[in-house]
Swiss-Prot record:
One of its GO terms (cellular component) is cytoplasm. This is Phosphoribosyl-ATP pyrophosphatase. It is found in: Cytoplasm. It is an enzyme of class 3 (hydrolase). InterPro entries: HisE, PRib-ATP_PPHydrolase-like. It holds the Pfam family PRA-PH. Pathway: Amino-acid biosynthesis; L-histidine biosynthesis; L-histidine from 5-phospho-alpha-D-ribose 1-diphosphate: step 2/9. Keywords: Amino-acid biosynthesis, ATP-binding, Cytoplasm, Histidine biosynthesis, Hydrolase, Nucleotide-binding. The keyword ATP-binding applies. It comes from Pelotomaculum thermopropionicum (strain DSM 13744 / JCM 10971 / SI). GO terms for molecular function: ATP binding; phosphoribosyl-ATP diphosphatase activity. Gene3D superfamilies: MazG-like. It catalyses: 1-(5-phospho-beta-D-ribosyl)-ATP + H2O = 1-(5-phospho-beta-D-ribosyl)-5'-AMP + diphosphate + H(+).
Length: 98
């Protein structure tokens, strides 16, 4: 699995966990708890990103950003959206500025 495909690969795992709801799966737990729990986790992870950045960044910042991206992907799945939807929006915005 290359770095280029990691977002898509992770998103596919999220979708699989949502569908199959395996015991002990954190992702399945988030879907079971619902949107409010997912949003709460995004808020917590965003705050942790800010703290890691203020504390000098580095590996801690990378780790917290990875946690935030994961939870954002869960939210996309909750709403029936895909990472490509966000990428398409970013590309469209870039085209407008060029």
């Amino acid at each position: 699995m290359g770095e280029k495909d990691i977002i898509r690969d992770l998103y596919e795992v999220i979708l699989d966990r949502r569908q199959k709801q395996p015991d002990g799966s954190y992702t399945a737990y988030l879907f079971e708890q619902g949107e409010d729990k997912i949003l709460k986790k995004i808020g917590e992870e965003a705050a942790e990103v800010l703290i890691a950045a203020k504390n000098g960044g580095g590996a801690a910042l990378v780790g917290e950003m990875a946690d935030l991206v994961y939870h954002l992907l869960v939210l996309l799945a909750w709403h029936g959206l895909a990472p490509e939807d966000v990428l398409a929006e970013l590309a469209a915005r870039r085209q407008k500025k060029s």
